[in-house]
Amino acid sequence: QPLEFHKDLTYPNIGPRDSYLLYHEELESLVKNFPTIKRARFWMTFGQEYLTHLRVIQNIGMASIEPINYNGMEIVPLQFLKAVLPNPQDLGENYEGETSIGCRIRGIKDGKEHTYYVYNNCSHQAAYQETGMQGVSYTTGVPAMIGAMMFLKGLWKRPGVWNVEEFDPDPFMEALNKYGLPWHEVFDGDLEL
């Protein structure tokens, strides 16, 4: 069942949050390109109020993509819902708190088990002041811009189709620091895995 698996995970400067195990397409290419990975998971947080809204939308049929007849017109419930709900771009001013995106890694190095955590927190308010958008949009747009810049500078350019993890990560990580998404590292900490 969707959102069936969840547990509390602690996020830096945020604290514990109920985190849900989800599918994310990035996991497919990561395990393909790093075949020694034994387990890769994607966790995301949702507030209970948000989840309640999602359940209600699903239960009353508004998440459907199947057309229905309404007053002699064919409409798609999900498209109708999108038309009547506020534009997410208009909500950024009221967002508070931070996003937290990271990788929690456990493995063997030099015969010993180690953990490594690399993460970034992004303030919704700071992102809004800079761009007029909230932190989720910021943490989506800045890495995409950096990837395009890596390509245009020839740092990430070779014949064929490649995933980002197949390129040198160092210039990308340096650019994250430069363009507003500084990252932090924790070595051999408790990762709640």
What is each of the regions a protein language model found here?
Residues 1-193:
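C-terminal catalytic/substrate-binding lobe primarily of soluble NAD(P)-dependent oxidoreductases
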